[in-house]
Regions:
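Flavin-dependent oxidoreductase catalytic cores
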Residues: 1-465
Length: 465
């Protein structure tokens, strides 16, 4: 009998059948090409997780707009027709292993840098013809705050001129015509995803990005058709959904990822500031009425990011009540990444009806074979995420230094091309001194099979994790 019967049962999102309930959650890690296409590194990164047994991969936040929509230099894009063919190649490689592919469509809104808004289109055009330009670009990017202070760059965009308290960028309100153009761009990007052979799309309406900024009364203070009342604040996302249906048809699945609680009260703001859970439930129910196929439950914004990123101090499954409450109020499938640390926890949350699909982000950075090991009844072999957030910190630093993110417990993450999964056992009887018998040192001895002389000031190995 399968140890995790519910976790490895089939599931369905819209018209798409999934082989199990394990979903790779979208994460931007800087493995894309500077032209918005997936190169060999990104393809191997995703393919390894597909080989590892997940049922669905939702790709990283993918930009739909080149004017003010780039989030990072090495971010996926589906804003141009030239992005279709490279994306299709990646989709085929993922499909080869039985996993489905959804593409997350994204616009950063106010949570962006003026440097990208002001220079990206020109930089991308120059960089395609003169690769040496990127050395200059990334040197400047490392001093983005100083460049911003010159006042020469255009502001970032949002529903209303409410700056992000973390990014602290000049912010302007989108014009009505610009909003309508963005609706068309989301639809066009979804059509490109469909033409590339992917199985569906996810709209990124969480973590404080543009779609969420329209939904939230904190960031949306407009007085026109796109602001004010609940119906008006819902208009942007509902028009995007309608446009995707128009361009892609009724059978092309759409997931909406939403922050059902922004947690502004936790940083000293009024208790009813922004989106609270009651408002999040209203949003989820309205999205179901609009015909989306699943809700991906998340929380918070850049200003409250601990309630989204969940550092080490947060309790396992602490926000499962958010997904459970949404599931009690909608009839479509619910996905959620609820700080899930083990297959046992995942199975239990499915059995309790907290959610329908288990979204894993960092756990799949730590161990791409998480699903296969769980299915084979070998959960003790899973390399566990320690929630240190090095993946996030290294991604932010790498974004301005032209290098991908990293994982503290898996050196191959985002380096699958350069580091083989099964390194050559080349000890050949040599004696190698390993200074420090911590996790990394001991792991190196085991994997490379040298005759090692370990030096550790403690009297036992692996003293610190």
């Amino acid at each position: 009998m399968q140890q995790y019967e519910k976790l490895f049962s089939e599931g369905q999102i819209g018209t798409v059948q999934l082989k199990n309930r394990v979903v790779m959650s979208p994460m931007v890690l800087g493995t894309g090409g500077l032209d918005g296409t997936p190169g060999e590194q990104m393809m191997q990164y995703y393919e390894e997780r597909a080989k590892g047994g997940v049922g669905l991969i939702i790709t990283e936040a993918t930009r739909v707009d080149e004017k003010h929509g780039p989030l990072a230099p090495r971010q996926l894009a589906m804003s141009k027709d030239r992005h279709i063919e490279p994306f299709a190649k990646m989709v085929k490689r993922i499909h080869r292993h039985g996993a489905k592919v959804f593409c997350q469509l994204h616009h950063p809104g106010r949570q962006n840098l003026s440097l990208l808004v002001g220079t990206w289109r020109l930089s991308e055009a120059i960089g395609r013809h003169w690769h040496g330009y990127w050395d200059i670009f990334f040197k400047v990017a490392q001093h983005a705050d100083m460049v911003e202070k010159t006042g020469l760059l255009p502001p970032v965009v949002a529903p209303s001129p409410v700056p992000c308290r973390l990014q602290k960028q000049k912010t302007r309100a989108l014009k009505t015509a610009e909003i309508k153009e963005l609706v068309r761009e989301f639809g066009a990007a979804a059509k490109r995803v469909q033409l590339a052979g992917a199985d569906g799309v996810e709209l990124h309406g969480a973590h404080g990005y543009l779609i969420q900024e329209f939904l939230s009364p904190y960031t949306n203070r407009r007085t026109d058709e796109y602001g004010g009342s609940f119906d008006n604040r819902m208009r942007f996302i509902t028009e995007i959904i309608a446009e995707i249906r128009r361009q892609c048809g009724a059978d092309f699945p759409i997931i909406a990822r939403i922050s059902v609680d922004e947690f502004y009260r936790e940083i000293g703001d009024p208790a009813d500031e922004g989106i609270t859970l009651d408002e999040g439930i209203r949003i989820a129910k309205r999205l179901e009425e609009c015909g989306i196929d699943a809700i991906d439950v998340s929380s918070a914004t850049y200003e409250t990011m601990n309630y989204w990123l969940e550092p080490t101090s947060f309790q396992t499954g602490w926000r499962s009540y958010l997904a459970k409450t949404v599931k009690q109020n909608v009839s479509i499938p619910v996905l959620a990444a609820n700080l899930i640390r083990s297959p046992e926890q995942a199975e239990q949350q499915l059995k309790e009806g907290i959610q329908d699909f288990i979204s894993l982000g960092r756990p799949l950075l730590a161990d791409p074979d998480w699903a296969n090991k769980a299915k084979a009844g070998r959960p003790e072999e899973i390399r566990r995420c320690i929630c240190c957030l090095w993946c996030f910190e290294s991604m932010l630093d790498g974004a301005v230094r032209n290098r991908p993110g990293q994982c503290a417990v898996n050196p191959r993450t985002c380096r699958e091309v350069g580091i083989p999964k099964e390194p050559k056992k080349d000890g050949d009887g040599r004696i190698v001194a390993i200074v420090g018998a911590g996790v990394s040192g001991v792991k190196g001895v085991v994997e490379r099979r040298e005759n090692a002389m370990k030096e550790e000031y403690q009297k036992f190995i692996a003293p610190v994790i």
